[in-house]
Amino acid sequence: MRLRVSLIAALAPNMGIGEGDRLPWKMPRDMKFFRLTTRGHVVMMGRKTFETFGCKPLPHRFNIVLSRTRSYKGENLTSARSIEEAIDIGLHMTNRARLFVIGGGNVYRQAIEFADEMYLTYVEKAEAAATQDLFGDESFYADTFFPEFGDRDWLTCHVSRHYRALDSLRAPAEIRPTHYFRFWKLARRTVGCSLSESRHLMHRFGTTQLELPFWDRSYLSQRSNR
C-alpha cells in the first residue's frame, strides 16, 4: 500500500501560519478537525514544532521529528534526518495510511514537493468574510509562512462553508467573532480527488460554490484590470 503524504495547516490570506512559537488565532473547531483527521496516522514535524508540544508526542498518532542534530526515541516517537527518511519510516508502518506534515514553515517548504494532498484551514478577518473579499489586505501578523503554490499543480476537492472562530465550541450564537475560517481539501492533479472522501467532507462540513482558488492572486489581479 502506498503511503499518502498530506500537508495540514491553518493559514491567513498572506500565507502566514505562525508568530513566534504560537498560532495567530484560537480556533477550537479547527483543533478538533486536526485531531480527528490525523488520529491513527503518522505525523511529521520539525524540532521547534515538537518543542511547542513540550517535547511530548501527540497521542493516538505515530510521531516523527525532523532533526539533523537531535535524536528522539520513545513510544510512538522517533526522529528522521530528512523528509525522505521520514516517508520511508512511514512506508514500513503497514497499519498507517497517511503521513501528515504538521509544521513548521521550513518543513512545509521541504515537504510540499512530496505531498499528494493538503488540508488547509483558511482564516480571514470578519470584515473580509462579510464582504466576501477573500483577497483583501486585512490579515494577521505572522513571521512564519506556508509555501506558495498554484492551481496548475493542485485541484480543489472541497471547500466548506464559513465557520465562526470562537474560543469555545459552545459559545452563544450572538457573540460576534473577530474572524472566520473555511476548510479546504486539495489534491495534486496527478493524484486526483477522492469522491468518497469529498462526500464525507461535504457531509461533515457543508460546502460552497466558490470556484476561485484562494491562492490564485495572479488570476484575481488580471480579472480586476479588465
Language-model region placement:
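Enzymes that bind and transform nitrogen-containing heteroaromatic metabolites
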Residues: 2-226
